[in-house]
Amino acid sequence: QLDTDLTAYLICAQEAARRMEGGSDILFIGSMSAVSQKPGSSIYIAAKAGIEGFVPAFRKELAVEDIKVGLIEPGFTGADFQYPEFPPEKQRELIGKHQMLRAEDIAVAAHFMLTQPRRTAVSLIRVETRLEHP
């Protein structure tokens, strides 16, 4: 799991940065799991915490080349593949109760991060549900 959830991020990021020109952006999608640390998924949490540690250092390394690096950490977000215990109708219910995010919520954060002036660095956005989820 670390190979997929951490090592792949690092390898892809380093290769992308090598090919990029100034004025580019790298946007990582991490997870609130890095900070919420719920039991039962310690390896996944370790991977996401690794990304959370990697991104600020990587941002500093690439800043002089005018490559911005940001991290979005979504909370509980609806997805068919991730939560088999929450079928689509239950996810719609939780979204309606403000207890689950939609992918569009993360896209809004990404758009905000990527459309800021080059002089600014929105380096971390945490997107959480307004109310606690089950």
Language-model region placement:
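A hydrophobic alpha-helix adjacent to the NAD(P)-binding/active-site core of NAD(P)-dependent oxidoreductases
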Residues: 1-2
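A short helix-coil junction within the Rossmann-fold of NAD(P)-dependent oxidoreductases
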Residues: 15-23
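Residue(s) in the substrate-gating loop at a strand-loop-helix junction
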Residues: 31
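Alpha-helical segment proximal to the catalytic Tyr-Lys
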Residues: 18, 60-63
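Active-site loop immediately N-terminal to the catalytic Tyr-X3-Lys motif
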Residues: 23, 36-42, 98
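C-terminal helical subdomain
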Residues: 71-72, 90-134
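Active-site helix of classical SDR
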Residues: 13, 47
